[in-house]
């Protein structure tokens, strides 16, 4: 989180910031979306023709193919989600451009108020049915700010949807459709806690406007923190996969060899020649689903601090640096790099340069570990932090606040 620059003690740029790596590879939210988030690149609106839905069970398909069996299991429950929103734009944006106003002078434009025009922005993503009465799981960014939501099943049935609830922090949303009493095919939900690196991973969705597309890969890694993926405004540990995921896959299921949902396809990290996909673990999605159904929103705890994992070697490097104006304890812990004004951490008296070594008596060694403990707490819960400040150990109680999504 950002903090104001002040005359406070500065930490050694060479010793500390050299350990902080800014991720330069692009992260793409996999949808032809409606609204671009500052840290995420989005695909252009979909304008290509849709492919004819493919048959899922060819009569002479290989009966020993676990992929075909998994697709037969999950396929009917996977949906395409089309969204629209109307935005109003000025016909001549140059009227508001500071460059043109400075070049021509404000008097040149006078009080001219250019006419506004409306545009319809379209996006597309995927989802899957979690309740046969018409409840669908998808990504929050797929349906963000949508005026209209249309859900299409593989069998061609179409429904008008409404967003039942969304949580931008975990990028999950529920869409509800009126089935007029019809039961929809539902996805079989697996257990992401049982997933292991090397397991088969099958991604199903509507990438690039091509309906019912299936790709195969493996689970490449588990517990990839959103900050490591390049999405710092999310609070997630992702399943990483090499199953091909493209724009339009967002919100669709990542399934195991039995056709059970283990994750929700959310993002890709692009690199020359290949891409890496990331899915939200389905166990996380189930927890969010419960809160969205109950409250229509999800509450997240926060402290309002900027953190850096500290090692004894990093502290020694800092302390040897003649340009450093602060000495750090040579311990394993979490260095507070900044404190947000008026945040719970500031209210409790935490300061830049404090080193947290334990929470509620349990040692903490990395920033991610500390962040997970904060996220696991209830809003308003008091956390007892063991902190080293100016070489002295002290206890500071801080009460978590509720993170405001934005």
UniProtKB/Swiss-Prot annotation:
Q: What is its EC number?
A: 3.4.21.-
Q: Which residues form the active site?
A: 141 (charge relay system), 171 (charge relay system), 250 (charge relay system)
Q: Which Pfam families match?
A: PDZ_2 (PF13180), Trypsin_2 (PF13365)
| UniProt cross-references to InterPro entries, sorted A to Z | HhoA_HhoB_HtrA-like, PDZ, PDZ_sf, Peptidase_S1_PA, Peptidase_S1_PA_chymotrypsin, Peptidase_S1C
Gene3D superfamilies linked: 2.30.42.10, Trypsin-like serine proteases
Q: Where is the PDZ domain?
A: 289-391
- A single Gene Ontology molecular function, please? serine-type endopeptidase activity
Q: Which GO terms describe its biological process?
A: proteolysis
Q: Which UniProt keywords apply?
A: Hydrolase, Protease, Serine protease
Q: What class of enzyme is it?
A: hydrolase
Family per record: Belongs to the peptidase S1C family.
State what protein this is by name: Uncharacterized serine protease syc0938_d
């Amino acid at each position: 989180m950002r903090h104001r620059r002040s005359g406070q003690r500065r930490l050694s740029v060479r010793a500390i910031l050299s350990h902080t790596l800014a991720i330069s590879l692009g992260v793409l939210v996999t949808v032809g979306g409606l609204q671009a988030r500052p840290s995420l690149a989005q695909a252009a609106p979909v304008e290509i023709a849709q492919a004819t839905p493919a048959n899922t069970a060819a009569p002479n398909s290989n009966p020993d193919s676990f992929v075909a069996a998994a697709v037969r299991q999950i396929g009917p429950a996977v949906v395409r989600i089309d969204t629209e929103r109307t935005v109003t734009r000025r016909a001549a944006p140059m009227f508001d451009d500071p460059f043109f106003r400075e070049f021509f002078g404000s008097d040149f434009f006078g009080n001219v108020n250019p006419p506004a025009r409306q545009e319809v922005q379209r996006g597309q993503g995927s989802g899957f049915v979690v309740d046969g009465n018409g409840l669908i799981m998808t990504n929050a960014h797929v349906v963000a700010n949508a005026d209209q939501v249309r859900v299409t099943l593989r069998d061609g049935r179409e429904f008008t949807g409404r967003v039942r609830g969304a949580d931008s922090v975990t990028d999950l949303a529920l869409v509800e459709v009126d089935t007029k009493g019809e039961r929809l095919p539902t996805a079989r939900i697996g257990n992401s806690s049982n997933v292991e690196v090397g397991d088969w991973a099958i991604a199903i969705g509507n990438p690039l406007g091509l309906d019912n597309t299936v790709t195969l890969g493996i689970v490449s890694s588990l517990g990839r923190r959103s900050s490591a993926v390049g999405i710092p405004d999310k609070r997630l540990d992702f399943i990483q996969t090499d199953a091909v995921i493209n724009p339009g896959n967002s919100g669709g299921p990542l399934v195991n060899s039995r056709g059970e949902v283990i994750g929700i396809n959310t993002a890709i990290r692009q690199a020359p020649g290949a891409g890496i996909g990331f899915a939200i673990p389905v166990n996380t999605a189930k927890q969010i689903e419960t809160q969205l159904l109950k409250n229509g929103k999800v509450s997240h705890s926060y402290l309002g601090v900027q953190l850096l994992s500290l090692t004894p070697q990093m502290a020694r490097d800092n302390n040897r640096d003649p340009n450093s104006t602060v000495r750090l304890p040579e311990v394993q812990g979490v260095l507070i790099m900044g404190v947000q004004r008026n945040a719970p951490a500031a209210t409790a008296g935490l300061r830049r340069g404090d080193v947290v070594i334990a929470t509620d008596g349990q040692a903490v060694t990395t920033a991610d570990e500390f962040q997970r403990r904060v996220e696991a707490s209830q809003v308003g819960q008091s956390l007892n932090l063991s902190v080293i400040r100016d070489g002295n150990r002290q206890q500071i109680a801080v009460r978590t606040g509720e993170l405001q999504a934005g």
